[in-house]
Amino acid sequence: MFKNMTLLGTLIEHSDGLPLLETNMKNMHKDHNQDASLTLLASKYNVLFPGIYMPMTLENASIIRLVKKVYETGGIIGIVAQKKEDVEATSAQDIFTIGTTARILKLINLPDERVRILLQGEEKFQIEDVIAETPYLLASISRLKDKTSNTQSKHFKAVVSSIKETVAKLISLQPEFPTEIKLLLDNINDFNLLTYFLASGLDTDIKSKQKLLEIHDSKKRGTVLLKYLLKDLEVSKLRKKIQDKVHTDIEQLQHDFYIRRQIKVLQEELGENEFEDEIDELRAEGEKKQWPKEVADYFYKALDKAERLSPNSADYPVLISHAELMLELPWSVYTTDNMDLKMAKKVLDTEHYGLEKVKERLLEYLAVRKLTQNMKGPILCLYGPPGVGKTSLGKSIAKALNRKYVKVSLGGLHDEAEIRGHRKTYVGAMPGRIIKGIQNSGSSNPVFMLDELDKITDLRGDPAAALLEVLDPEQNQAFVDTFLEVPYDLSKVLFIATANQLDTIPPALRDRLEIIEINGYTIEEKLQIAKKYLFPKQRKENGLKATDLSIHDTAIVKVIESYTRESGVRELDRKLASLVRKVGKAMVLEEPYPKKIHKEDVISLLGIELFDQEMYQQTHLPGVAIGLAWTPVGGDILFIEAILSAGKGKLTLSGQLGDVMKESAMTAFTYLKANTNLLGIPDKVFESYDLHIHLPAGAVPKDGPSAGITLFAALASLYTQRKVKDKVAMTGEITLRGKVLPVGGIKEKILAAKRAGIKEVILSKENKKDIQEIKQKDIQDLKFHYVEFVEEVIQLALQPSKVEAAKDWSITKKRKQQPGIGHVSTL
């Protein structure tokens, strides 16, 4: 009974004793006209009864303004209960038709812009008609009066007596019941007030309370109230029975504990307490540890708890395994870093070709570590395509630093407990992978490789969010594993993450990473990697010596260009392994084999070529332009073909183009039409001919903005009948103002242009910095043109004169077809 004790406390605080309530009840019907209009306020969780106080918390701004106005003017407001708690009452259908008028006794502004009010119920009313529903409910009402029963009748006296008796029993079952409320109940002489008071405190639903409010006959209301009180009494008796049983069980547990302690003492006297020796051994090991006081206190507290438990208890092995983990962790144990920068550089160069940015960053870290001993470990993220050596670089870094190496594969990880650990209460609980890796390494400053960071999933919890604490240099000096439950310092750990793409890494996590991009290898770099690392490794793994087999550079280049298409070298490694195995098989079978593999031997050993290199193709037709494309496995060149045919100005795009590339084509076409005077193109050509733009290799999806200037060059060539210059390629985005914007993937595109035989490249002026990052020996035969506007592209890309047999677009005679071809690129 009286679940809402706050309500009763409010009543006691503001009633000032019974006479105030009696006076309110007697004067309740004064100075109010019948059928008056009244502003309504909906109550979600309770029913206000006449003569009763009730607090309410308001959040709606318009309702708060209304209530403040009523409070300041000392007016009254109608309180009606909502039919449903989970919706806002905005119409008459959402509320009951009978409510209680009220005065606002107190109004408090809360810090979060909400308002809390204290209401005093006065008299009941019935809604006759809703006048308005916005901004708040306004209704015409009629006042309702309770029907007073014959207080001298035997039935009435029996009801009153039963109610008071039942309430007394309820109070006796609840020792915590406030004394003030007991006194208040004993002194209420007005039966209506008594029933309303008890109804307001009933532990029942809002519909039952509304039912009591709507009963105007006091004797009938008392009878219904008595039923609710009797039901509440049965529930209270059952609750008391349960509480008594729980109390008895607790006493039994205490008794059992006392008996177990006696048994333990007897076991000690008999020398049978073998588990005590185990705990003593753990405590002795703990005394040898150099760990923080907080950790030591926790460790000894856990051992004390285990000592009090029976070895057969379910918690005992958990506490022991937890203590063993704490002992096995390398608290304050660090390996000594190799501070010889030259030696570290030699180790990195010996095992990995290229990757200059990563090596430079690592040497910077070592240099600063040499200058200061308190530097926190950086959080590096090696970002690049598969197979470029991101993961294997971790081992080399650990070797160069003279540190332990730990690798955790995050691909497919979907449970944050894998990172942060499980609670000890779970069956089979264990620490997370971070603490487990530290435990296995035996050092608190290993090189910790977090492989495939971009492939974490979040089916259960959010493992990426769990990594935020691990990878934040400001927080990881006190990382708390859920199983370990004490802080562990990860600030000296060198975390290195790897990722193939950044867009799948949450922004908050990416912000904590120092991103180092590793681009795909050039053919020259792949050649050097194959000569120095891959081929010798495969030869050794397959049981051959250097005197048995060698390979010519041209053969390696043949394998790279015709049998692999990747940014890294994984497939190249597999193809070289295949070459070595085939030679090894021939040796065992005593068949003839080449002791040095040349270019001509590759096809006979590996079979037909798998890939054709896209090469520049000379054409005499206008409407053809060469673009540069970026793909996940490197760069390539693509052709744009454009053709005009008799029609009505329709634009057709083909070649499986994405939305961005289609928009680039429309932008180029629109700019061309808007600037016909620039190229001397007659306006009528756009109305008399259909334009078709096509990108060959239609099965391959193409998208990106970098084909903008290539599309424009192809269209300008077609409409002016001036051919694009030989061996010229271009890349760049265009705008409707004719401005050329920078694009990405420049290194891969430029290397692809060189492989294809291109001699000149046109690109945005803002991409000049990207060219400067490419090794000069890789681009020494290329000439670069940097442009800001498409007018410059026309001067650089198109021949000054028209082709032979150039078409005259001013002649509008219908033709079967106007030849003119072209090719496009993607980003």
Swiss-Prot record:
Its main location: cytoplasm. CDD domains: RecA-like_Lon. The keyword Hydrolase applies. This is Lon protease. PANTHER family: ATP DEPENDENT LON PROTEASE FAMILY MEMBER. It holds the Pfam family AAA. The keyword Nucleotide-binding applies. Induction: By heat shock. GO terms for biological process: cellular response to heat; protein quality control for misfolded or incompletely synthesized proteins. It comes from Amoebophilus asiaticus (strain 5a2). ATP-dependent serine protease that mediates the selective degradation of mutant and abnormal proteins as well as certain short-lived regulatory proteins. Required for cellular homeostasis and for survival from DNA damage and developmental changes induced by stress. Degrades polypeptides processively to yield small peptide fragments that are 5 to 10 amino acids long. Binds to DNA in a double-stranded, site-specific manner. Residues 38-233 form the Lon N-terminal domain.
